[in-house]
Amino acid sequence: MKIGKHAIRRYKKRIGKRTATRERIEKDIKKHIETSTIKKVYYKETGQYRIWTPKFIAVCEKGMVVTILPPNEN
């Protein structure tokens, strides 16, 4: 799964260290998605699916994480 630049920027802003490298943040996002996924929901009208984890919600399009949302947003 690819991680977009916007998703990395949002992750740095909300959760991770701001000085971390892109590769380190990609590993961290992938690890959270693989190990602690709560649920996945597909939205037919937009073609997106969202992956809920305890730390964040990953919004995905075409196999790529587009953005990161806080866990309390829908």
Sequence positions of predicted segments:
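Ribonuclease/tRNase effector modules and their secretory precursors
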Residues: 1-74
